[in-house]
Amino acid sequence: MTVAISNPAAPPVSARAYLSVIGGTCALLCTVGFVVAFGVFQGYYTEHLLRGMSEFDIPWIGSASIFLLYVSAPICGVLVDRFGPKVLLIAGSIGVLVAIFMISLCSQYYQIFLAQAVLLGISMGFVTWPPFAVVSRNLPHHRGLALGVITGGSSVGGIVWSIMIEELLTKRNLGFPWTVRVLGFTMLPLLAFACISITEPPKQSQPQPRPALEATVEGGSASPTPKPEYASLPLLRSTVFISICVGFGLAFLGLFNPFFYISSYAAGHGASAQTSSYMISIMNAATLFGRVIPGIVADRVGHYNVMIFVLLASGITSFCWTEVRSLTGLVIWSIAYGFSSGAILSLQGACAGKIATPQNQGKAIGFLQGSLAVTVLVGSPIGGQLLGHYGYLSLSMFTGATLVMGAVVMGYARLCLNRSPMEAHQFRFLLAPN
């Protein structure tokens, strides 16, 4: 059987679409970017504000924040598909700012947990997920690049917030409360711009033409075009979708461990406190390029193909973690891991969006992110337990193993695209590189 595919020409990109990308970048700079800078907070809490707490207790603040960020994704996905992004963005932005200013008043573990984990985590979810659905709808022909750019905002945030905290706390001696308040005042205009600029594409007066998919079998007869109602088949019945949820779930068990523990590893190998904190900034700077460049490549050679490669690359890099002992080597290692892991974070939305109709982009991305909530909750505390009992070697082996297992499952999902043509029809897959 021969499959011929004709794609409609990509429409010109509107100013509205560009503004949505910029607004989404600002949104993720203030949300995920703040989360990935938690390593700096963790170091300060361990040495000063929460001195005496165990290596197991403090990571729960960051993990719970990420958990609530991800567990809110399915709800946000459904709401943004139904009501649009504005209400979610405004409510979430207010919640983020309230949480930031509440952190500045905290001095006890339970207070920090309620403000930085619970309130901030939930509020960030309402700001983080709407841009993914809106940008996917605005730029369907450049989804990998567009989502790479907006997730690049989290990399910029990880750099900016880490350096700001370090500068204000140690060099300016501003104190923890006012340092956190400065962060909040910096976020205010960025979140306001995100609320204004992230808008849905204009509704079409007629349904957009679907890609023509014609199949010719031996004997000259052609198979019928897939029925439109196939597009509404529930995602949770898709073998491919279930496989990518499992694959990302395994990978996310260890994905964030280097971001949380690279500073303490550097300090343990002779780096100064300032240099150790800058390791997080170096890693986040590398993720910026990792989120954008692989997105450009993935739009050409396939999102699933690139995802499998970067999962394997991240896993192999993690296995080499404890073999790096010099400062120069640690910088190179941080760049390598940051680049490959950045691609994982940016392309997951493109992989999910590939199997959904334009109207269901929010649901597809939301269900995927929601399925990762438990693994991101327990991943870093498990890493902390391994570190406390067995050292960094066990932490690096755990991180590498989860990423490689994720790559294997993603490889299975990739094979399912070729072996299940009916499911490909049902989800409007193009039988091209995936």
From Swiss-Prot:
InterPro entries: MFS (IPR011701), MFS_dom (IPR020846), MFS_trans_sf (IPR036259), Proton-linked_MCT (IPR050327). Pfam families: MFS_1 (PF07690). Induction: Expression is up-regulated during co-cultivation of A.fumigatus with Streptomyces rapamycinicus that triggersthe production of the polyketide fumigermin during the bacterial-fungal interaction. The chain crosses the membrane at residues 21-41, 60-80, 87-107, 112-132, 145-165, 182-202, 240-260, 278-298, 301-321, 327-347, 364-384, 393-413. It is found in: Cell membrane. Keywords: Cell membrane, Membrane, Transmembrane, Transmembrane helix, Transport. GO terms for cellular component: plasma membrane. Belongs to the major facilitator superfamily. Monocarboxylate porter (TC 2.A.1.13) family. MFS-type transporter; part of the gene cluster that mediates the biosynthesis of fumigermin that inhibits germination of spores of the inducing S.rapamycinicus, and thus helps the fungus to defend resources in the shared habitat against a bacterial competitor. May be involved in the secretion of fumigermin. This is MFS-type transporter AFUA_1G00970. It comes from Aspergillus fumigatus (strain ATCC MYA-4609 / CBS 101355 / FGSC A1100 / Af293).
